[in-house]
Amino acid sequence: MLDKKTLEKFNQEHLIEFEKLMSSNEKEHLSEKLESLNLADIRNLYNDLYLNKKVIDDVSSVNEVKYDVKSEFTVDEIEQYEKIGLDAIKKGKFAVLLMAGGQGTRLGYKGPKGSFEIEDTSLFEIQAKQLLALKEQTGQYIDWYIMTSKINDKETQLYFESKNYFGYDRDHVHFFMQDNIVALSEEGKLVLDVDSNILETPNGNGGVFKSLAKSGYLDEMTENGVEYIFLNNIDNVLVKVLDPLFAGYTFQKSMDITTKSIQPKDGESVGRLVNANQKDTVLEYSELDPEIANEFNNANIGIHSFKLAFINNVVDNDLPYHLAIKNLKQLDEDFGVIELPTLKFELFYFDIFQYAHSFVTLQVPREEEFSPLKNKEGKDSVETATADLKRMNMI
């Protein structure tokens, strides 16, 4: 039996009505789940991020980051960075971390986004091919850590098995899952998913390091002598996975965080790399006044190297949640399936930047290194991704 007094206190009394329609099993699961939740924290999230949502319009303490521009490097500098990078990779100083917890829903595709194929080559394979090329160059397999989610973990692993890991050594491919967090209605109420459980969604890419630690892989990296983690996501089809130049740049600069950026277009809805209160960080486009966003010259493209010692030091530090509103399937009061705007709470990995003591940015050419695949048609679509991959001779 649910505690009516507690539920009323936190605006969740509707669950008592849901409980009346449930089987004994479902009631038990609901009760157990509610016991594991901190309803006060959930109410605070709702109040802070939805009811009192703030947009950053005062940037008096926000400045441009210091950055290098790849196109301004001399031939000698490029060769030197590449030499340093290949040597570091050969010595096992880098691991690669891929964030791939999403589904291909917006592409009109059922399945993990990474298994979506463009002209018979999946997004996973595009990245695996680059790691295989590095193996040929260095003689070393780089450990590849792939973050999945509850919604795609099993399918992702089965996909890799069906493709024989694209010829990569399966002992060097490691999967782990990101955590979930409850979703809420626009009234701040917990909702039920189509299986009559409290609806949860992946907690955003910011949980990547805690999940990596929980899986034991952070310790494994340390034991293996890894010094840097190269991080990227599955969305960018032109990503250069641990390209030797960036590896060498990372290794020589020896910063807590080394990041890639591109020159943003006016009005482009990507986060901006900025220096705020003496710390390099990312301000999300949705949290910035559009006119102010256009003042900054470096867009975040989700490609970074993190010093492993830095991650080990800060992995337990708290990160703030951010709000996203998505249409999600859920049960109505009669247990019918409906789709409604739902509040998702997400951690962003770049909020860990606030704890870094050193940071450097390398601006790279957009046309060579950035082509996000987000939509079935139009902007950032299958068509644009296909054209860019062909232009760069990647398919």
From Swiss-Prot:
The entry assigns this protein to a family as follows: Belongs to the UDPGP type 1 family.
Give the matching Gene3D superfamilies.
Spore Coat Polysaccharide Biosynthesis Protein SpsA, Chain A (3.90.550.10)
Per its UniProt record, what InterPro entries does this chain match?
Answer: Nucleotide-diphossugar_trans, UDP-sugar_pyrophosphorylase, UDPGP_fam
Q: What is this protein called?
A: Probable uridylyltransferase SSP0716
Alphabetized Pfam families for the sequence: UDPGP
What keywords tag this UniProt record? Nucleotidyltransferase, Transferase
Q: Which domain of life is it from?
A: Bacteria
The EC designation for this entry is 2.7.7.-
Any one GO MF term held by the record is: uridylyltransferase activity
